[in-house]
């Protein structure tokens, strides 16, 4: 047995004896490193005569290739073994009884709880829940809501756009849940025209929305809820009553003072922002008392252009709509300081702020439970 064969046998034995990736790396350095045994053999080729190099070169290079391949195979084997061992170690027997601990019982996320609370309150007022796609067309997200091409209000939304499809139709992640209002009005208008059923629209629309914004009080994905009423006699007084009843029920106070400030939204006219009376002197906001005011939502009468584009004659029908951020009012009601924690999947956070699975939405007296 010559020196190369003896060296190869020794290296292969060392490779086989390695029990982890650190051991494999040590063998690689000893054999193929800058001062490794195989590397030293390769260096001797430079001092050989052409005849000797022609004889020894293929043998030494072949040794290097076989060692490299053996190292790779052994490393793969060890990685597979490590994964198998980890799977065996972390295997869960699903037939075992659940251990009675806070973590094992799980918690309802505050966003899910607040959505349940909101929809339950409006359901008691006779509203139904409507939903729509997260991916919308430019038409439904902007144009049908009275955002004309080039309107500066479009620039107010830092929007996630998709590349145009084969129909050259620009799509995007919706920046608000308002497109569902248009879809619903179109559906009811078609039903009225085809079947003669002129039904009142009363819907509440919870869902995810998307904008390029991220800080302690903003997230690129956030939750929003909107409401819409369309009828021949809908008016601002109706809207104010609905919102007052909602605020009392949601914040669980017997009365609430509201003030409406003129504002601007392309899809409503007139448009107002709603503040409610509160006390912000302590660590948590208290509603229904104090001398402070806090903005809660935006609302207004549905713009005639929106009604018209959705199949309703604004000379006959009127509507009102409102919208609010679910994440924000959840933070206000339950005292959560940082919006980003909603999406961190921290078990400690969800144990503190989460709700038991059997909790029912908290409804104020006067609404059914």
Curated annotation (Swiss-Prot):
Mg(2+) binds at residue 269. Its EC number is 6.1.1.20. GO terms for biological process: phenylalanyl-tRNA aminoacylation. One of its GO terms (molecular function) is tRNA binding. GO terms for cellular component: cytoplasm. Binds 2 magnesium ions per tetramer. Its cofactor is Mg(2+). The keyword Cytoplasm applies. PROSITE patterns: AA_TRNA_LIGASE_II. CDD domains: PheRS_alpha_core. It is found in: Cytoplasm. It catalyses: tRNA(Phe) + L-phenylalanine + ATP = L-phenylalanyl-tRNA(Phe) + AMP + diphosphate + H(+). It comes from the Bacteria. InterPro entries: aa-tRNA-synth_II (IPR006195), aa-tRNA-synth_II/BPL/LPL (IPR045864), Phe-tRNA-synth_IIc_asu (IPR004529), Phe-tRNA_ligase_II_N (IPR004188), Phe_tRNA_ligase_alpha1_bac (IPR022911), Phenylalanyl-tRNA_Synthase (IPR002319), tRNA-bd_arm (IPR010978). It is an enzyme of class 6 (ligase). It holds the Pfam family tRNA-synt_2d. Keywords: Aminoacyl-tRNA synthetase, ATP-binding, Cytoplasm, Ligase, Magnesium, Metal-binding, Nucleotide-binding, Protein biosynthesis. The keyword Nucleus does not apply. Belongs to the class-II aminoacyl-tRNA synthetase family. Phe-tRNA synthetase alpha subunit type 1 subfamily. Tetramer of two alpha and two beta subunits. This is Phenylalanine--tRNA ligase alpha subunit. It comes from Brucella canis (strain ATCC 23365 / NCTC 10854 / RM-666).
